[in-house]
């Protein structure tokens, strides 16, 4: 039987061993997040690092904190989260211990009933916790997180559709497509794809499904930004559209300095196609008048000469929706766990209404040089 001294020594050894297992954090050289005590990090995992009024927070830590209300307008504080509320939430989190790293400052708690686990967002991501970016923005620990019924025979036998590398042996690191059951992805690959394509271009890489696929990805904790795609936000992304076409496409160019040279005025002025703007010609190369400013290329001239519009042109589909700019985050407490209730419906094509057919016989008339022709073939001068 152990003595009291031996029991205390065993407890001390167990405590020291437990301390060594805790993730050691390097001393920070810059600002850290008030709600997870970490540095800026990867925006795809933690969101944008926001700094204002001597307060610095990760965007994801801000919207996922369990007791942080959004009481302000979108242009106040941090997307509607007021500084005084953030300070109160940081004070509350300072009393909560993370079940992963065993340190204080855990602002997120598991939303499962009777679960008392709290965790920092980065710690939870390392352990396999899951946070949902819709509705009430709930978070779950690794024991109570939503799961998928992925067939284990696929893991290790197939590769990720996006990166073409082998799938992870851990099911929490893989996500299965709801519309293409044979397609399985790495979680990090889907998150990177969602961060790049954003809401307006996010769809199934296999079948282009834009309804079930985004809803399932939201349920499985993928953050889909409500903004323009990353390639549209790059500086000078549309600079090519502002470049004027500068080439003569006439069959025989008569200009001595070549097809890529032209003058601002006169016979060697470059005239662009009035329909497409992607073809050009010198005035003399196409025998245009000195004051002519309108010209059409061979590809557009037949279409421009067509004046007849068929009666069933109303069957041509067109897009009836318009583009909406980025919207600010707003936490909705009325939505359930189904992401379809908070996911904006993707625009569907609509059909133009067919014009009502006129009753009776139609009357057509043409006027040319004083001659009037009607459907009864009567002529009068």
Swiss-Prot record:
CDD domains noted in UniProt: ePHD_PHF7_G2E3_like, PHD_PHF7_G2E3_like
| ZnF (RING-type) intervals | 160-208
Residues bound to Zn(2+) 5 are 179-180, 204, 207
Per the record, the zinc finger regions (PHD-type) lie at 96-145
What keywords appear on the UniProt entry? Metal-binding, Nucleus, Transferase, Ubl conjugation pathway, Zinc, Zinc-finger
The segment annotated Required for interaction and ubiquitination of the nucleosome core particle runs over 67-92
Specify the effect of residue 119 to S. Reduces ubiquitination of histone H3
Query: In its keyword annotation, does this UniProt entry include Cytoplasm?
Result: no
Please tell me in which tissues this protein is expressed.
Answer: Highly expressed in Sertoli cells, but not in germ cells in adult testis. Expression in embryonic testis is 30-times lower. Highly expressed in colon, spleen, white blood cells, pancreas, lung, liver, placenta and brain. Detected at lower levels in thymus, small intestine, ovary and kidney.
Q: What GO terms in the biological process aspect are recorded for it?
A: negative regulation of osteoclast proliferation
Zinc finger (C2HC pre-PHD-type) positions are: 30-68
- Which residue stretches belong to region Required for interaction with ubiquitinated UBE2D2? 150-307
- Name the top EC class: transferase
Assembly behavior: Interacts with MEF2C; the interaction promotes MEF2C binding to its transcription targets. Interacts with GATA4; the interaction promotes GATA4 binding to its transcription targets. Interacts with UBE2D2; the interaction inhibits cleavage of PHF7 and promotes association of the complex with the nucleosome core particle.
Q: Does the keyword Iron apply?
A: no
Gene3D superfamilies assigned to the protein according to its UniProt record, in alphabetical order = Zinc/RING finger domain, C3HC4 (zinc finger) (3.30.40.10)
Q: What is this protein called?
A: E3 ubiquitin-protein ligase PHF7
Which SUPFAM superfamilies does the record associate with it? FYVE/PHD zinc finger
- Cellular compartment(s): Nucleus
Which residues make up the binding site for Zn(2+) 2? Answer: 98, 101, 120, 123
* Binding positions for Zn(2+) 4 per the UniProt entry: 160, 163, 186, 189
The UniProt record gives the binding positions of Zn(2+) 1 as 33, 36, 58, 61
Q: At what residues does the UniProt record annotate the site feature described as Cleavage?
A: 149-150
What does changing residue 126 to Q do?
No effect on ubiquitination of histone H3
């Amino acid at each position: 039987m152990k003595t009291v001294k031996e029991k205390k020594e065993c407890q001390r050894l167990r405590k020291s061993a437990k301390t060594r297992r805790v993730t050691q954090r390097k001393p920070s050289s810059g600002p850290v997040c008030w709600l997870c005590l970490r540095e800026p990090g990867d925006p795809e995992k933690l969101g944008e690092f926001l700094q204002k009024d001597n307060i610095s927070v990760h965007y994801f830590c801000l919207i996922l904190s369990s007791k942080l209300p959004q009481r302000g307008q979108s242009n106040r504080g941090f997307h509607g989260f007021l500084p005084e509320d953030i300070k109160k939430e940081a004070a509350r989190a300072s009393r909560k211990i993370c079940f992963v790293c065993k340190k204080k400052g855990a602002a997120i708690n598991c939303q499962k009933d009777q679960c008392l686990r709290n965790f920092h967002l980065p710690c939870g991501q390392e352990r396999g916790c899951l946070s949902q970016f819709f509705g009430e923005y709930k978070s779950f620990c690794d024991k109570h997180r939503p799961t998928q019924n992925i067939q284990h025979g696929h893991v290790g036998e197939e590769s990720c559709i996006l990166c073409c590398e082998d799938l992870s042996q851990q099911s929490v690191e893989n996500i299965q497509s709801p519309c293409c059951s044979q397609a399985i992805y790495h979680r990090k690959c889907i998150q990177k794809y969602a961060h790049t394509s954003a809401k307006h271009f996010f769809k199934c890489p296999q079948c282009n499904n834009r309804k079930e696929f985004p809803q399932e990805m939201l349920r499985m904790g993928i953050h889909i930004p409500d903004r323009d795609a990353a390639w549209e936000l790059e500086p000078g992304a549309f600079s090519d559209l502002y470049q004027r076409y500068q080439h003569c496409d006439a069959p025989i160019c008569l200009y001595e300095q070549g097809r890529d040279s032209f003058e601002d005025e006169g016979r060697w002025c470059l005239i662009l196609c009035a329909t497409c703007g992607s073809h050009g010609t010198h005035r003399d190369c196409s025998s245009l008048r000195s004051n002519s400013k309108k010209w059409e290329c061979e590809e557009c001239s037949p279409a421009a000469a067509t004046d007849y519009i068929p009666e069933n042109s109303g069957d041509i589909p067109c897009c009836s929706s318009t583009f909406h700019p980025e919207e600010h985050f707003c936490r909705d407490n009325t939505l359930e766990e189904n992401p379809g209730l908070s996911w904006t419906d993707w625009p569907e094509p609509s059909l133009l209404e067919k014009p009502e057919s006129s009753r009776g016989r139609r009357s057509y008339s043409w006027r040319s040089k004083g001659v009037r022709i009607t459907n009864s073939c009567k002529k009068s001068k």
